[in-house]
Structures are given as structure tokens and as C-alpha cells.
A protein has these predicted regions:
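Short alpha-helices
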Residues: 122-189
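Generic enzyme active-site microenvironment
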Residues: 36, 40, 96, 118-119, ...
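Short, hinge-like loop/turn segments at secondary-structure boundaries
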Residues: 82-86, 134-137, 286-287
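Glycine-rich, phosphate-binding/catalytic loops in enzymes
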Residues: 51-53, 111-114, 134-135, 188
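Active-site cofactor/cluster-binding pocket
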Residues: 77-131
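Structural signal for conserved beta-strand scaffold positions within catalytic alpha/beta enzyme cores
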Residues: 67, 96, 118, 133-135, ...
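Hydrophobic helix-and-loop "lid/oligomerization" segment in the mid-to-C-terminal part
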Residues: 13-76, 86, 90-92, 175-335
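Short, Lys/Arg-enriched N-terminal segments with co-localized hydrophobic residues
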Residues: 1-17
């Protein structure tokens, strides 16, 4: 006898197989494929983009496959992105990975593509593609690309190069398999790509090794972050601090989980000034209160316990902190 959850799981698996077959069919139909990522990409974003590119290239050598957009300092080591002229787009299949809404897609030329496919593990906020595979049960978009390979490996070829970037994305978006989004499937797929021949130590060095300046900056954070009696922790990082410790906004904002292991804190946030963007990067993390609705209120989005947005100024940051503290207060009342 099938229980409700078993039936639901079976239905989702059948849907996933169906939509994967449709995606594979579209890939076969097009000679040119252009893959886009989101603004300020993280390793999961670049990993799923380049991983899919390498997967398609190895499986269909005659196709022209491009990965477009810009890197952050954190992702440059993962592989080169492509420069594509405007005239290539009108006859191309565009695939958008790890992003749920149009305003966060890097390179607006995605609109010029003949057809569009979306592959994303964030909650659905906007429908804009001809074909959309959106599933929040995956801990990372890289896990979705690995699943795409696993379920269709009779027609697809996974290379060492693809395995390397997919593992990097899976590793970082799960907090080294620590977050509660991790499932048995996540671990199994991590093991599959880990078996491929790439330099694990070199990969870890790019992701986790720190300079003396970096370590001093982390020490400053631990000595100067703020927190409330409701369990909210937060850190404001302005340009003066970035200059003092010789760190980039990319690196600084990536340290948000520095506050994640403090037992007094149930929600933590980083606010990092980015002169290049003219905005303040805002990262939300939680092990209790749901944060993606708060992020959406300020024009952002993401997962239930990991989200972000861009604030226009420090006055907006103050409002976010006030709302977040109230969220923590209400959450504690319900315990």
C-alpha cells in the first residue's frame, strides 16, 4: 500500500523524468545553446552553468555551447566564461540556471533567444520560459545537473572537468553537506562526482584557504558583530572596512556563515557595501525563522533559510534589521 508521501514522491519523480526528457529533446534540436546565470554568481551558480556546458559539449561535440555572464572573485577559478555577439542569440536555445526571476539574470540578451529553458532549485516566483524545471527538493542547482546526467546517462557524457565544477557548487551550496537541505540523494550525487579525476586539494584551496588578511578580517567580524536578545546577529561592512583589511565585497559577503555556529543566534545577516554595484549586499541566513519572505519584501528572494537582496542605502539596512529582529521575536514566541 502506497502512503500519501510515497505517492507524492512517485509523482514528482515521474514529472522530473518527463521534464528532463523534454529538456534533452530541446538540446538535441538546437545547434547553438547559450547558458546564463544570475548576477553576483556563487559557485553553485557557475558550477551548474559550466557543468551543463561541459556535459552538453562532451555529449554533442558538434554543438556550439556558450556560458555567458560575469564572474565574481570567488568563482573565477572555476573556468572561463564566453563572449558572445548579439547575432548569435536569435537562433539559439537559451538555458537559465539557478535563478528564478528575470531581474536577477546576468546579461539581458537572454530575451533574444529563440526558446528559453529554466533550471532552478529556488521557490517559484516568476514564469517566463518555454520550459521550466523548478524543484526546491534539490539542495543545489548543481545537484539538478548531476541528476539530469544520472537519469540520462545512456545519452550524456560527464567529464572530469564537469564533475569538478559540479562538486564545487554542491559543496558550497550545502555548507559542505551541513545544511538541512541535504538529502540522501545529495550525498549520493556528491559521491558520484567525487569519484571523477580532478584535484580535490586544489579545489578546496580555492574555496576555503585564507590569507593572513582574510583571517584578520574574520577575527574583526567575531569581535565586532552585533546581536539582539531575540537571537538576531548581524554585521555591517562598509567600504572603509573593506579597504582596511584589503578584502573584496565578494569575499566579505561570502563570510555570512561565520555567525552561523553561535548558539545564541537563530538568524544572522551580513550587509556589505559594494561600490561597483552602488548597493549594499544583504545576505540572510537562519536555522529557524523563514527569511525568503523578508528578502522578497525588499526586492530579493531565495530559499526559506538562505536568501538575499540588494539594499539602496544604510537607512534601508536599519529597516531590514528591525523587521528581522521582529521575525526572530515572533519565532521564539511559537517555540
Amino acid at each position: 500500500m502506497l502512503l500519501y508521501n510515497d505517492k507524492r514522491k512517485l509523482i514528482m519523480e515521474e514529472f522530473t523524468q518527463m521534464i528532463q526528457k523534454e529538456i534533452l529533446k530541446k538540446i538535441k534540436e538546437y545547434d547553438t545553446i547559450i547558458i546564463h546565470h544570475h548576477v553576483n554568481p556563487d559557485p553553485d551558480c557557475i558550477g551548474s552553468q559550466l557543468g551543463l556546458k561541459y556535459l552538453i559539449q562532451a555529449s554533442f561535440p558538434d554543438k556550439k555551447v556558450y556560458a555567458v555572464g560575469t564572474h565574481t572573485e570567488r568563482t573565477k577559478f572555476m573556468g572561463e566564461l564566453d563572449v558572445v555577439s548579439d547575432e548569435v542569440f536569435p537562433e539559439a536555445l537559451v538555458i537559465i540556471v539557478d535563478v528564478g526571476d528575470t531581474k536577477r539574470i546576468d546579461d539581458e540578451r537572454f530575451k533574444l533567444g529563440k526558446e528559453m529553458i529554466k533550471i532552478d532549485h529556488h521557490p517559484l516566483t516568476e514564469t517566463f520560459c518555454n520550459l521550466e524545471w523548478v524543484d526546491t527538493s534539490y539542495a543545489a542547482c548543481c545537484e539538478m545537473i548531476i541528476d539530469f546526467y544520472v537519469q540520462n546517462q545512456d545519452e550524456l557524457i560527464l567529464t572530469n572537468e564537469a564533475a569538478r565544477v559540479l562538486y564545487a557548487g554542491l559543496l558550497t551550496d550545502t555548507g559542505r553537506f551541513y545544511y538541512n537541505s541535504v538529502t540522501e540523494r545529495t550525498l549520493r550525487y556528491g559521491a558520484i562526482v567525487y569519484e571523477y579525476d580532478f584535484d580535490k586539494l586544489e579545489l578546496y584551496s580555492h574555496l576555503y584557504f585564507r590569507s593572513v588578511d582574510d583571517l584578520k578580517f574574520v577575527g574583526y567580524i567575531m569581535n565586532n558583530f552585533e546581536y539582539t536578545e531575540n537571537g538576531l546577529g548581524y554585521m555591517r561592512i562598509n567600504q572603509e572596512l573593506l579597504d582596511k583589511f584589503n578584502v573584496s565585497p565578494d569575499y566579505a559577503s561570502g563570510l555570512v556563515n561565520t555567525l552561523g555556529n553561535l548558539k545564541e543566534i537563530i538568524m544572522w545577516m551580513f550587509f556589505t557595501e559594494d561600490k561597483g554595484l552602488g548597493k549594499i549586499r544583504t545576505s540572510f541566513r537562519s536555522r529557524g525563522p523563514i527569511v525568503n519572505k523578508l528578502a522578497a519584501k525588499y526586492g530579493g528572494g531565495g530559499h526559506m533559510w538562505a536568501s538575499g537582496t540588494l539594499a539602496d542605502n544604510w537607512e534601508t539596512v536599519d529597516k531590514i534589521i528591525k523587521d528581522a529582529d521582529e521575525l526572530c521575536k515572533e519565532f521564539k514566541k511559537g517555540l
